[in-house]
């Protein structure tokens, strides 16, 4: 078995779960890092969030803790799909930059990311993490499309 891990992007969404399932199907038994990237907020956003959530706690820690919970859920799903998975959480803005940075750091064989299937105006306003990852990564990127009805 190849020791080079795959990187699976996971945010708890249905498209992220489909990405895990696709990775397990294409790379059975492979070592995988399941990554959730939490947004890195500005100081003003952090102060507002901290004061309303947990006084005296650094918001970045709260944000990373939440991302780690999400990544652990994804890693559990990946292990159930027979991948050798470990969770990882990072904070970054934009999200795609955090994904590309981690992929480079772990020398991922491939980045697996789900797509919400946005197009046209919606994609222009909301952005597409999968598109940006594919545009900026220096390694293969597998974009798993949404389920079509």
Name what the model sees in each region.
Residues 2-55:
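Small/aliphatic-rich secondary-structure junction motif
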Residues 3, 110-136, 146-149:
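Glycine-rich, Arg-bearing micro-motifs that act as flexible, cationic patches
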Residues 25, 104-105, 135:
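Solvent-exposed polar/charged
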Residues 21, 100, 131:
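Active-site phosphate/pyrophosphate- and oxyanion-stabilizing loops and adjacent acidic/basic residues
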Residues 1, 76-111, 148-149:
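Structural beta-alpha unit
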Residues 33-35, 86-90, 142:
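General small-molecule cofactor/ligand-binding pocket signal
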């Amino acid at each position: 078995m190849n020791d080079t891990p795959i990187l699976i992007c996971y945010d708890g969404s249905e498209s992220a779960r489909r990405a895990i399932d696709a990775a397990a199907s294409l790379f059975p038994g492979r070592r995988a890092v399941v990554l959730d990237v939490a947004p890195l907020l500005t100081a003003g956003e952090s102060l507002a969030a901290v004061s309303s959530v947990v006084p005296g706690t650094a918001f970045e820690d709260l944000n990373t803790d939440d991302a780690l919970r999400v990544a652990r859920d994804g890693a559990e799903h990946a292990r159930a799909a027979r991948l050798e998975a470990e969770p990882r959480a990072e904070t970054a803005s934009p999200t795609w930059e955090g994904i590309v940075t981690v992929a480079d750091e772990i020398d991922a064989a491939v980045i697996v990311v789900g797509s919400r299937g946005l197009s046209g105006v919606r994609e222009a306003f909301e952005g597409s993490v999968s598109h940006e990852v594919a545009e900026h990564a220096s390694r293969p990127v597998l974009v798993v499309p949404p389920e079509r009805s």
